[in-house]
């Protein structure tokens, strides 16, 4: 009995050590706040950041994760933004009919317009007692002088839509519902992107039947339920980790799928199979919104793994049971020269119409 109590206390202590945000660590470098010298000086004050990883996204959403020693980044800083510091084998990722085996070189061009995140390995401590960190810098993939990755497609798509909208509004032809829009005062077209991330968590060694999950869903057993045990602890830590990286989490809650977890003789939550959701603040930079989503998935996976839980972001991981929807909220607005912002998707009469003509 005493041994069991000690084991339980030890587990609790370890969990407490895991979930504390370390104020001595650097979790992200905000875009636009530091120049070259500022970034280099900041990194030198955090020697536990030992690696740099350029994060490129292929056409299937896979992200690269290599380990470049931090000394090379500090020495060749400008080369990382010129696309001459790091290359990868494009034939090994999903770039269909673009980077082939005999023409596979893809250059990685670092992106300074978005936040850079630091990913820490808590299983590997540096000499100062802090976990070893990797600076993750989002990048574009360049092949034969052309950008070919998902991030560049998103950037070019937004630029294309903005240009077409400017041309439409400045054409002189009346746009229904936009007659009062001060076209001559428009300085820029901007986008707002907000995502909602749903996911399933489960105990890896346990398997629940579709029938059990389906019955629970029909009976609405998980609707408005509280999170308990290691699921609650992992969710709370994930929120703290995301907030520490400047994502401004708005909500974490249970979704409709799942079953009630069991409790063992020591009070530990076991046999977990639940559906959850995490939401954070939208971004005025579509690339930043996409990067936030990717980084959030990585952090959530790592945090829940520490508590013995497996995470799936698949749209339909279990046939016949509620899937994980990916709600993406898109807004388009006109930024005026006087600093005012006008929502281009809102109709002139909110009671008569749902959306504007645009």
Go through each PLM region and give its residues:
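Short, internal active-site loops enriched in acidic
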Residues: 59, 204-206, 261-265, 317-321
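A short mid-domain helix/strand-loop element embedded in enzyme catalytic domains
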Residues: 256, 263-275
């Amino acid at each position: 009995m005493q041994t069991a109590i000690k084991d339980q206390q030890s587990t609790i202590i370890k969990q407490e050590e895991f979930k504390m945000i370390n104020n001595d660590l650097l979790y992200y470098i905000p875009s636009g706040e530091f120049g070259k010298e500022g970034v280099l000086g900041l990194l030198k004050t955090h020697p536990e950041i030992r690696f740099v990883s350029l994060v490129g996204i292929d056409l299937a959403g896979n992200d690269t994760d290599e380990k470049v020693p931090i000394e090379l980044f500090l020495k060749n800083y400008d080369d990382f933004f010129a696309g001459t510091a790091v290359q990868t084998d494009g034939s090994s990722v999903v770039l269909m009919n673009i980077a082939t085996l005999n023409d596979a070189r893809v250059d990685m061009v670092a992106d300074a317009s978005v936040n850079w995140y630091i990913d820490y390995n808590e299983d590997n401590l540096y000499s100062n007692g802090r976990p070893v960190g990797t600076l993750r810098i989002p990048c574009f993939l360049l092949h034969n002088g052309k950008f070919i990755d998902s991030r560049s497609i998103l950037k070019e798509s937004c630029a294309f839509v903005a240009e077409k909208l400017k041309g439409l509004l400045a054409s002189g032809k009346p746009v229904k519902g936009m007659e009062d829009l001060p076209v001559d005062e428009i300085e820029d077209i901007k986008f707002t992107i907000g995502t909602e991330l749903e996911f399933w968590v489960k105990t890896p060694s346990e398997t629940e039947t579709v029938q059990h999950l389906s019955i629970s869903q029909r009976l609405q057993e998980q609707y408005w339920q509280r999170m308990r045990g290691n699921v609650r602890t992992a969710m709370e830590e994930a929120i703290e980790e995301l907030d520490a990286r400047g994502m401004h989490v708005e909500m974490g809650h249970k979704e409709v799928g799942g079953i009630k977890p069991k409790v063992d003789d020591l009070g530990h939550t076991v046999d977990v199979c639940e559906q959850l959701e995490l939401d954070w603040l939208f971004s005025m930079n579509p690339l930043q919104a996409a990067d936030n989503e990717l980084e959030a998935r990585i952090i959530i996976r790592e945090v829940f793994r520490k508590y013995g839980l497996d995470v799936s972001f698949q749209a339909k991981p279990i046939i016949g049971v509620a899937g994980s929807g990916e709600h993406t909220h898109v807004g388009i607005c006109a930024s005026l020269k006087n600093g005012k912002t006008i929502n281009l998707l809102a109709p002139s009469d909110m009671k008569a119409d749902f959306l504007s003509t645009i």
